[in-house]
Amino acid sequence: MQLNSTEISDLIKQRIEQFEVVSEARNEGTIVAVSDGIIRIHGLADVMQGEMIELPGNRFAIALNLERDSVGAVVMGPYASLAEGDKVKTTGRILEVPVGRGLLGRVVNTLGEPIDGKGPIDNDGFSPVEMIAPGVIERKSVDQPVQTGYKAVDSMIPIGRGQRELIIGDRQIGKTALAIDAIINQKDTGIKCVYVAVGQKASTIANVVRKLEEHGALANTIVVVATASEAAALQYLAPYSGCSMGEYFRDRGEDSLIVYDDLSKQAVAYRQISLLLKRPPGREAYPGDVFYLHSRLLERASRVNAEYVEKFTKGEVKGQTGSLTALPIIETQAGDVSAFVPTNVISITDGQIFLETDLFNSGLRPAVNPGISVSRVGGAAQTKIIKKLSGGIRSALAQYRELAAFSQFASDLDDATRAQLEHGERVTELMKQKQYAPMSVADQSVSIFSAEKGYLKSVELNKIGDFEASLLSYMNSEHADLMKTINETGNYNADIEGELKAGLDKFVETQTW
């Protein structure tokens, strides 16, 4: 058989012409629906849960629903210019935010972009917003205090480094004020702070930033903002972004404090997203995983051991533990702590500070209810002198409230009951404290010492505030060395007790209040 070269070349040409290249774009899709910040995409075969999707105009969305023939994604920011038919691409990345010391003193949005007009941020790298919390073996028990500067909190509901302490109460009752004062009190302690504002008015946040700056605490603080006017996706992700920024310090053997203000609004934003994605609603129309929404966030607040820090820093930092302390805020409706989100967060956290409307309206600020407020782990971290002196404060207030209710119906009271009532009234008055005036350990110790040792008995009820102010001024000027020792060591012994007693005896003799 003779082969004809012409025939062979014609046959090859024919085969080449008939050959069809069938390619399938697995990482590019088309928007088929846009509504309320949610887009539905067809054609993204290789997308992963939580992956960032690139949209036209250098914007991004996050894939949350992976269905058989479409993907539900939530847009990070404005979505008005998106239209059906727009092409989108997968990125192979999850959402990351800038972290580092360059963020301290700055106001940023959920994505870590500066919104304070102070120019670009010099960050130390990027960190994913969703991080797995440290494991059991990597953690260390809480045994170092975080001083809030509030007598009522530091004496009765102490907070430790690495703890999660919920601040809960109705609106306009002083929840944010308590958290902001706790941040202000850290300006000289070395604890780095993160304040996350979720779903608040821009004017309110501007006021908070101004107050932090006035009191010299902004240089030590990162403010993460997702205002009420921003997309629900940004409000939902803001706490996770702030947490990653706080974890940067924890993982390098430092201490940090994060305030989530507030997680009720984050839960509402997540409910909005879930309902728009057509996920089945549960109790109060929240999705089934709203508990996990908060638990995976709050579990990241922890105290990690020196081995974890050494491993993370590749041996650069040795022998130092790190901590991230969380103060989540929850807003209740008419004091109802049995609602869905409040009960969830109460069960996740290591205690709660309950602020009560009736106490607030009666003039008690901070309006802490010591009866149902608790710190489950903070007792081990409490400063020695405060722990020793404040043992009777909580019981005195509890007995006072009980007797005060009873005494309304009883006409004649015995001397012991009357003495308990009078002591309780004075302790309640002593627990009052002005906003933006956090107290040092020594100042708190002197105030509590005066109550515990009976120095308030001879003071008129309406003069207790003046008595305390004059006493602290006297002690800081006449017994400066003692106050310095208490602040530096936090110890309490017979010598310190003797000096405190001598100082108070001398002050009471002066009658200068």
Swiss-Prot record:
Membrane topology field: Peripheral membrane protein
Functional summary from the UniProt entry: Produces ATP from ADP in the presence of a proton gradient across the membrane. The alpha chain is a regulatory subunit.
Family: Belongs to the ATPase alpha/beta chains family.
EC identifiers of the protein: 7.1.2.2
Oligomeric and partner information: F-type ATPases have 2 components, CF(1) - the catalytic core - and CF(0) - the membrane proton channel. CF(1) has five subunits: alpha(3), beta(3), gamma(1), delta(1), epsilon(1). CF(0) has three main subunits: a(1), b(2) and c(9-12). The alpha and beta chains form an alternating ring which encloses part of the gamma chain. CF(1) is attached to CF(0) by a central stalk formed by the gamma and epsilon chains, while a peripheral stalk is formed by the delta and b chains.
CDD domains found in the cross-reference section: ATP-synt_F1_alpha_C, ATP-synt_F1_alpha_N, F1-ATPase_alpha_CD
Record-listed ATP binding positions: 169-176
Reactions it catalyzes: ATP + H2O + 4 H(+)(in) = ADP + phosphate + 5 H(+)(out)
Marked site positions, Required for activity: 373
GO molecular function per UniProt: ADP binding; ATP binding; proton-transporting ATP synthase activity, rotational mechanism
Origin: domain of life: Bacteria
Subcellular location: Cell inner membrane
Organism of provenance: Shewanella woodyi (strain ATCC 51908 / MS32)
Name the record gives this protein: ATP synthase subunit alpha
PROSITE patterns according to UniProt: ATPASE_ALPHA_BETA (PS00152)
A single Gene Ontology CC term: plasma membrane
Record keywords, A-Z: ATP synthesis, ATP-binding, Cell inner membrane, Cell membrane, CF(1), Hydrogen ion transport, Ion transport, Membrane, Nucleotide-binding, Translocase, Transport
